[in-house]
Amino acid sequence: MGRIKKKGTSGQAKNFITRTQAVRKLQISLPDFRKLCIWKGIYPREPRNKKKASKSSTHSTTFYYTKDIQWLLHEKIVDAFREQKALERKISKALGRGDASDAARLERNASRPEKTGKTKYNLDHIIRERYPTFIDALRDLDDCLSMLFLFANLPSTSTVPAKMIARCEKLCLEFEHYLIVSNSLRKSFLSIKGIYYQATIQGQDILWLVPYRFNQRVTGDVDFRIMGTFVEFYQTLLGFVNFRLYTSVGLVYPPKFDAARDDQDAGLGAFSLEGNGIGAIEQPKQITNGDASKPDPKLQAEIDKLMLQLNAPEKEVEETTKTSPDGEDEEQATETIDKFEPAAPGGDILMQPSYSATDPSTLFSKFTFFLSRETPRQPLEFILRAFGCKRIGWDAVLGEGAFTHNESDPSITHQVVDRPPVQVQPEEDEEVKEDNQTAQRLRPGARVPGRIYIQPQWIWDCINDEELKRPDLYAPGAQLPPHLSPFVKKVRGQYDPSAPLEDQEREDEELEMDSGSEDEADVSDEEAAVQKQDLVTAMDVDETAEGMDVAGSDDESDEAPDKVDESFGGFSEAEDSEDEEETAALRRQRELEAELSGVALQEKEVDPRAKAKTDAKKKAAKKAKEEDEELERSKMMMSRKKRKILEKMVYSNKKKDAEAEALRAKRRKIEKSGKAAPRE
C-alpha cells in the first residue's frame, strides 16, 4: 500500500507562494522586495485555483512562483537590503531612546537613495545577466532613454532628489554627444507629447521621446518610488551602453565635465571629448643599434628592380583598357539604383534603396545658425550638431557655449525665428545709430541683408527628407506646410499625405467623386428646370390643339425621376438597355409635343465632361460587379473556415479603402479651393 500523500506538499500549493510568505522568506522589506522583482524580472503569477494554492487567499492575494523566490535567495543585493533593514531598525531604536546624536551618526552611515541619489550596492551583475550581448541592451534602450530624459526635465522634490536628476541629465548629454560624433541620428518629429528622435546604432533603430522644457508640475497621484526604481536600473544600463559606444569610436569615457559651465546652462558645451587612440594605426619602428643607419644602396637597387617588374603587368592592363574600342560588350558601372517591384499587382510595397548625392551628416555643415531667444535652444543645438553644423550662435540669455552671442555677426547665414513678423520701427537719431552698430542685438523686426530667416520646422523637415527645403515656405509669418511623421510606414491602399494625389487615386476616381457631388448639388435645379419646361409645353399644346389628348401625357410628372436616372450607370446590360429604351421613348414624346405645338425641337447640348463622368461611373460599376462575381466564384471552392477569413479580409480592406478615399476627396476639395499649403 502506497504512502498517503500529505496535503500541501505538491501541486499548486507547492508551486506558488504568496507575497507575504516571499517577503518573510527573503527577510527584506516590502519596498526592497518590489525593487528586487523589478530588477530581476520576476512577475506575479495567477494560479488556476487560488484556494488550492493557499487556503487563506482572497481575490487580491498576489502569488509568485516558488522557484523564482528560491532563485532570489542567492542574489547578492539581498544581503545589502538586509544590512539596510538592520541599520534602519537601529536608528528607530535610538530615536525611541531619545539619543538623537547616535541616530544622526547611524543616519550618516546609512545609504538612502531617496536623499543621496546613489546607493552602496551596484547593479552591474544584473545588467550583464539580463543583457548577455550588447545588441540586447540596444534593443531595450527605447524605454530607458524616454525615462531618463523625462527625469532630467523634472524639478527636484522629496521623492525625486536633485542628484538623481543631475545624473540623468549627465547620462543623456553623454549619449547625445555620441550621436553627434557618430552621425547616428536619423529622424525627429514634433508632437504634442514632446519631440521624438530616432537613431540607428549598429543596425538597431532606437526611438525615444523627450518632453518639452516647460515648467513641470509634479502631482501626488504618481508613484515616484516605483519610477525611481526603474530610473536606478536604467542609469546603470545607459552607463554601460555609453561606455561601450564611446570606446567603439575611440573616445575616453567618461568625458571631461566642466561643472562651472554647466551651472551657466552650457548643455552640450559643458563636456569635452578626448580620444584614446584605439583606432590609430601605429607605424612599425626599426630596431637599430642606437643610430639610424641608411639602407644598403645595392639592396635598394634590387628592390626597385623587382617592384618595376611587378608593376609592369598592371601598366599593360591599363593601356589595353584605354585603347579598347567603345563597342565591346563590357559591363559598365552605372549610378542608377535597381528598383524593387512587387511580384504581384496587389503585393506589398517593397522598401526601395535610396541614394542621396549629399551626405545627411553634412547637411548643415556649410551654414552658420543663430537661434533667437524664443526658440528651443537645446533640441535645435542637438539636431544641428548631429547633422554637421559646427557654428551655432544664440542670445546670451540662453546660456553659454555659443559660437557667437552677436546677432549682427556678418558670418551668420541662417537665423531661426519663432515670432510673428513685426513692422520695422522708424530710424533713430545718428547718435543712437552709432551705439547700435556695436550692440549685439538688432531692433525688433530688423533684418540683416543676405541672411535667411526661417521657422524651426524648417530644420526638422530638412533632416527628415534628407535635403534642404525651400526657405521661403518657412519664412516668419508664413503658413507652414504640414509637419508629417517620418515614422509611418507606407502601406498599399492607404492614404499617403506626402505623395501626389495623382499617384494614389484610382482610375477615373476624380470624375466619379465630382459627378457624385455635382449630382447631389444640381438635382434640385434639374428638377425645377424640367418641371418649368414641361409646364410651358403643356400650355402651348392646350392653346394649339384645343384640348387634344396626347398619349402618355399623364406620365409627365415622372420625367424628373427618369431624368435623374439617366446619370446612373446601372449594374448589368439589361438595366443599360432599359435606360436606353426609356431615353428613346422620352425623346419620341418630346418630338410629338414639338410637332403639335409647331415649335422646332431644341436639341440638348451634351456636356463632354458630364458624359465622361457618366461613363466613368458606369465603368467603375461594371468593374466592381465583375470583381464581386469573381470573388463569389472563388468562395464557392473554399471551405467554410477559409471563406470566413476571406470575408473578414475583404471587409477590412473595403473599410480601409473607404477611409483613404474620404481623405483623398477631402484633400482634392482643399486643393481645388486653393487653401492647401504649398508643397516642396
Swiss-Prot record:
Its main location: nucleus. Keywords: Coiled coil, Nucleus, Ribosome biogenesis, rRNA processing. Residues 609-673 form a coiled coil. Residues 584-593, 602-626, 654-664, 671-680 have a biased composition (Basic and acidic residues). The keyword RNA-binding does not apply. Residues 359-476 form the BRCT domain. One of its GO terms (cellular component) is nucleoplasm. InterPro entries: BRCT_dom, BRCT_dom_sf, PES. One of its GO terms (biological process) is maturation of LSU-rRNA from tricistronic rRNA transcript (SSU-rRNA, 5.8S rRNA, LSU-rRNA). Pfam families: BRCT, Pescadillo_N. Component of the NOP7 complex, composed of erb1, nop7 and ytm1. The complex is held together by erb1, which interacts with nop7 via its N-terminal domain and with ytm1 via a high-affinity interaction between the seven-bladed beta-propeller domains of the 2 proteins. The NOP7 complex associates with the 66S pre-ribosome. HAMAP family: Pescadillo. Belongs to the pescadillo family. Component of the NOP7 complex, which is required for maturation of the 25S and 5.8S ribosomal RNAs and formation of the 60S ribosome. This is Pescadillo homolog. It comes from Botryotinia fuckeliana (strain B05.10) (Noble rot fungus).
